[in-house]
Every structure is written in structure tokens, then in C-alpha cells.
Amino acid sequence: MLEHFCECYFDLSGLILCPVLGSIILLFIPNSSIRLIRLIGLCVSLITFLYSLVLWIQFDPSTAKFQFVESLRWLPYENIHLYMGIDGLSLFFVILTTFLIPICILVGWSGMRSFGKEYIIAFLICEFLMIAVFCMLDLLLFYVFFESVLIPMFIIIGVWGSRQRKIKAAYQFFLYTLLGSVFMLLAILLILLQTGTTDLQILLTTEFSERRQILLWIAFFASFAVKVPMVPVHIWLPEAHVEAPTAGSVILAGILLKLGTYGFLRFSIPMFPEATLCFTPFIYTLSAIAIIYTSLTTLRQIDLKKIIAYSSVAHMNLVTIGMFSLNIQGIGGSILLMLSHGLVSSALFLCVGVLYDRHKTRLVRYYGGLVSTMPNFSTIFFFFTLANMSLPGTSSFIGEFLILVGAFQRNSLVATLRALGMILGAAYSLWLYNRVVSGNLKPDFLYKFSDLNGREVFIFLPFLVGVVWMGVYPKVFLDCMHTSVSNLVQHGKFH
């Protein structure tokens, strides 16, 4: 009876529309009813998260086919329609999205009076668009939602950013990502003219010439590389993180950076396998350089958010190495590391937000000795610092280990350079923790700092559970994605 109920009433359209309906309800509530606004926003986001967990329970990991498939004709053309579904490559990105949105609402809980209901609506709309990106199996609609995510994020950074340069950072973020995607739009139009469809499942059975594959692969790469971001188109990310509110940084690090790598997995690699093999040495070289460069750059930063932002660039370029190893270990490890990064990096930005709420600065030199005034915060910060270093037993370790195994099978030199990047990662992580938590207290007023309150502890708990769960028992996650990853490798004949 329960299975029949779930099959009938739990589908992707309901999941996608849930935050939209919540936003519509909030439009009719006056800003003065702040308690009701907060409660509705939190309830809608939690319902969406529980909805995604039900889909996980119903998900069949033994098949590589798309599940919960829905199709709707929205244009008067036979091969262009709203077509969506999920598989092992996209399932956990949907769950990660629905997990982080309630956190973002809780983060802005105390400042909701100044933010207003528009703040919650912006995050709910952002959730709707990001879930749609991970579910769309039509190239044209994927592009529409892929680009539409920019709008609420532009507003979140530009309106609720924390410093005077927030407008510049918002425009830089918007223009970088928009201009990169123009090439993908042209490629989609070219595909439509050649094949007459934008249906992914049809395109996966279409054989493009090697020359056409290379042209299309480059166009898609120009769009996805900016979102990852890969060097040298990573400049927008540190500025966006520094100026964004804490919840905005959580979405940027936790979800938005995954859109580019997901695009590689969903479209570039399976649709253009010959071009992928051709450009793999280029990706390996670019990613290895980026890991070393950004790790060294991180050691020179003085802003807490910039340190974590550059660390994110290094981790996401490690993800690209794993994906383009084109084997089961590398791709599976890259997906696991993306999920881990979504938890660990988001938690580190929350730690910075805790300090900024109390001190109104993110400069490292103003901190030190917090272990004596904020022991609970120091313990949590230490835990996520270790997770960022990929300590065994934490979520990042398994992902990085599998990526190294996959990379060694493809190119041992690049894998060796990545190992050097891990050493540098440990260096800047420990340096940051030592400067902020250890040593002597700097200004006298640091003695008046309050430790984590109940709401903040409650926010960190799910991250702690997730990081430990993925680190101690990753089989739950790897089993769900294994069949889809194997199918991807076999489809491209990469093995």
C-alpha cells in the first residue's frame, strides 16, 4: 500500500513545484508577519527535503535507466518537450539541494526582519531552478534553467551582500557565467538543426562526426568551465563569496559549483566521447595546474572567505580530474567528493558567518585564541578543517582516494601532482585553524564573544552527521550511483 501511494503521489513535478507553491503563498503574506513568513519558508523547504528523501527510498539502484520520468509537450514540435527524470548521477545532487535550502533559511533567521520575505522567496526560487537543472533531460530546457539560476543568485549577492562591493561582485558573477553560456546555446541550436531534437536520450544514440564532436565539446566546455570554476575563468568566485551573505556562500559552494561538473557528466562526456578522449590530456593539465596554483594562492590570502573560496576551486578541479579519468573509480569518487564538498565547504562558510556575526570582519589578523572564549565553535571548526584536509573517516577521504586510484590508471604524473596538492591543502587548512583558534587573544573585546547558541549548534549537527556518515559508510552512496557510472563508462567505450 505504501509503495503504491509513493508511486502515485511522489514524482519529480511535485518535488520541483513545492518551492514554487511556497513562494506564491509567501507573496500574499505581509512583511509585518515575520514569524509566519519564517515558519512557512522553513516548513516548505523541509517538506521539499523530505519529499526528496522519499524519492531516494523509491529509487532503484540496480538499473541505469532514468527513473520518475515525466514528459510534457510545451512546444508544437514533436522532439522538443519538457522531459525530466533522475538516475544515479543526479539523485544525490537533488537531495543535497533540498538539504541546504532549509539551512540557508535558518542561517538568516535572526536577521529576517531586515531581509523580509523576499529573502526566503529568493532561496525557494533558487531551489526550484537548481532541482530543475538536475532533473531536465532536454538540452534546451536544461540550458534555460541552468541560466535562470543566475537571476536569484544575482539578487541574493547584490541585495543582501555584506559589503559595499557587493554590486560589482554580483555583476561580475552574472557576466562571467552568462557570457560563457552563450557558446553552449549556439551549440544546442547547432544540435537541433542537425538532429531535429534536444531530447537527451535520442542524442545519446546519435553519432556525431569527430570534427563536429570537438566543436560542440568546446562550446559546452566554455559554459561548464566557468561554473566549476576552472583556471583562468575562476576570478568571479572569490569576489562573489566575499560579498555574498553567509547563506549565499552556502548555495554557491554547496550547489552552484556542481552545476558545471554535473554538465560535464550528463552531457559532454556521454554525448561527445571521442572529443572527451581527445581533450582529456588538456583537462588533466589544466586541473593539475589549477590545484597547485589555487593552493599556493590560498596560503597568501588574509580574508577567511577567500581562503575557503580558493580551497573550493582546488577541490572542484580535483573533481574534474576524477571525472576525466573516465573509469568507474574516478567518476564515482568525483561524485562522492562533490557531495562531500557541498557539506564541508558549506559548513566552513557557516563557521566564518558565525565569526562575522560577532565581530563584523573576516580578516584573519583580527582573530586568534578563540579556543578559550568559543570552545564549542573551535571544536566544530577543527572537525570541518580536518574534513577539508580529507582526513580518513571523513567524507572527503573516500572521494579523493577513489579519484587518485582512477587518476593513476589514466595518468600517474597528474595523480602525483594531485598528491602534492593534498599536502598544500593540509598546509593552508591547518594554517587557517591555527591563526583563528590557537595562540593568544588579539583585541580585548574578543573576551566578550559568546559561543555558539542553540540555533547555530542545531544548524551544524546535520553537517556533522552527513560528513561522518559518508566517511564511515560510503557504500550507501556508491551503490546508488554505481550502475549509472558503469553505464556511462560503457556507453563511451572508455574502459
Curated annotation (Swiss-Prot):
Membrane spanning residue stretches = 9-29, 39-59, 89-109, 118-138, 139-159, 173-193, 214-234, 245-265, 272-292, 313-333, 335-355, 367-387, 388-408, 413-433, 457-477
Which keywords does the record carry?
A: Electron transport, Membrane, Mitochondrion, NAD, Respiratory chain, Translocase, Transmembrane, Transmembrane helix, Transport, Ubiquinone
InterPro entries in the cross-refs = NADH_Q_OxRdtase_chainM/4 (IPR010227), NADH_UbQ_OxRdtase (IPR003918), ND/Mrp_TM (IPR001750)
Top-level taxon of the source organism: Eukaryota
Q: Which reaction does it catalyse?
A: a ubiquinone + NADH + 5 H(+)(in) = a ubiquinol + NAD(+) + 4 H(+)(out)
* Coiled-coil region: none
The compartments listed are: Mitochondrion membrane
Q: Which GO terms describe its cellular component?
A: mitochondrial membrane; plastid
What molecular functions are annotated in GO for this chain?
A: NADH dehydrogenase (ubiquinone) activity
Q: EC annotation? A: 7.1.1.2
Topology relative to the membrane, per the entry? Answer: Multi-pass membrane protein
Query: What is one process in the GO biological process aspect for this record?
Result: ATP synthesis coupled electron transport
Q: What does this protein do?
A: Core subunit of the mitochondrial membrane respiratory chain NADH dehydrogenase (Complex I) that is believed to belong to the minimal assembly required for catalysis. Complex I functions in the transfer of electrons from NADH to the respiratory chain. The immediate electron acceptor for the enzyme is believed to be ubiquinone.
Family as reported in the entry's similarity comment: Belongs to the complex I subunit 4 family.
What is the official name of this protein in its record? Answer: NADH-ubiquinone oxidoreductase chain 4
What species was this sequence derived from? Triticum aestivum (Wheat)
User: What gene is it encoded by?
Assistant: ND4
